[in-house]
């Protein structure tokens, strides 16, 4: 394996030096009938039913095939059957270990940490990644947002960490903490981008709390369309920090606008059949065919816009109705993408591009909320991490050659941070000078 991916993994190790572990169900929205496991980095022990060591120090070149056999997991290594067991675990022998998961007919993924495989009630394989918490957060950030500036990832890391800590027992009854789908937070691969890792490190220890110091709910969406929504307009609870706010930062982005064209008959019959409206009533017909939102509304003819969005699979509830009487056609001209509550990701991308600070962005979208820094566990680069980086430098001098390329530039930043740690300077994510030094345009 090349030096760069190994250094990336060591950077992830720095993220997780003092973090707890979480269990995340992988491929939660897929049916897994068969999967092949290979080893991208490091070695793993293969353990059956928590006690039986089937194989030790399995590494690059080995392949493990798993498939359900009744209530058991059938195990074969390099084509040789090892038996069938209630559970099979892949336990990493070091922090620098990566598994490659290749399910049949599904794009392969790579993950760090351990893997536990069982058969679920439906007779299919269930895969759970036992991984360091901050490594999980970095993977979530990579899966949930696009961009090329570190503060974008810092903001996403803070809200994703806050959500995870608040909902740490979401799937406790099923034996894990989270799933990898949007039901929880997307976690579709290990983080492989150094700029995302840097943003996650910058946010280490930071969460969002209300005036009483409690972790808040941190919903987010792709694009608000120009105005966020109140929580009670989408869900049941009115939360003081989830208020509708103007959001011009979401204009002129990828998901700012959308259009859906329907026949007049389909649009009108929907309200007649689904909601029992008298579509021949002049006032009802007029509202259904001329509905507009200069600012967000909640209903049309007393029908919740959230229900209309779900039934027609619209990108948002923020739309106007344009009626073409000659063509007997209705055009829904919409704004934004998502439920609209909380943080707009594309608004965040725009704000970061304008130089607005990460904490100002969070306060803009979460009314009255504050960023809390866990002073009991300040982020530092542990000595073990420094030694590993130093060893790589000594083994391959070319890894630290400074050129104009951005990849070499971020390596240089890592080494400067290593030197800062050796001078016993503790990294404070609220220090503006360090923030400036960390800015990285990947």
Describe each PLM feature range.
Residues 4-7, 11, 17-442:
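Conserved, single-site charged/polar hotspot
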